[in-house]
């Protein structure tokens, strides 16, 4: 499970086995037993959320938007796909 970064105790990561065929670019977020998955394109939106409150969800979206380039580079480096 490649961890892209950690911020405020949240782990932003993806899994090495992201489906066959592989799912589109996305990020998983985890903290204290709560998790969510966000699609990165065409805009940052939740695929699912299992317990984060509305304020935390807004903060997560902002972080993912701000660091989308880093997430995308890490994804492509890991899977060997072109950007």
Located regions from the model:
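A short, structured beta-strand/loop element
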Residues: 15-54
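Intrinsically disordered, low-complexity sequence elements enriched in Ser/Thr/Gly/Pro
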Residues: 4, 35, 65-66
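A broad, low-specificity signal for short, low-complexity segments enriched in glycine/proline
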Residues: 1-2, 24, 33, 75-76
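C-terminal structural segments of small proteins and small subunits
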Residues: 53-83
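Short, charged/polar N-terminal "headpieces" of proteins
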Residues: 1-23
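A generic short-segment signal for beta-strand/edge and adjacent turn/coil regions
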Residues: 5-9, 32, 73
């Amino acid at each position: 499970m490649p961890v892209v970064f950690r911020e405020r105790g949240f782990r932003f990561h993806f899994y090495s086995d992201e489906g066959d065929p592989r799912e589109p670019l996305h990020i998983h977020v985890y903290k204290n037993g709560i998790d969510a998955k966000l699609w990165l394109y065409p805009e940052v939106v939740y695929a699912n959320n299992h317990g984060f409150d509305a304020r935390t969800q807004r903060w997560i979206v902002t972080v993912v938007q701000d660091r989308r380039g880093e997430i995308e580079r890490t994804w492509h480096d890991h899977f060997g796909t072109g950007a």
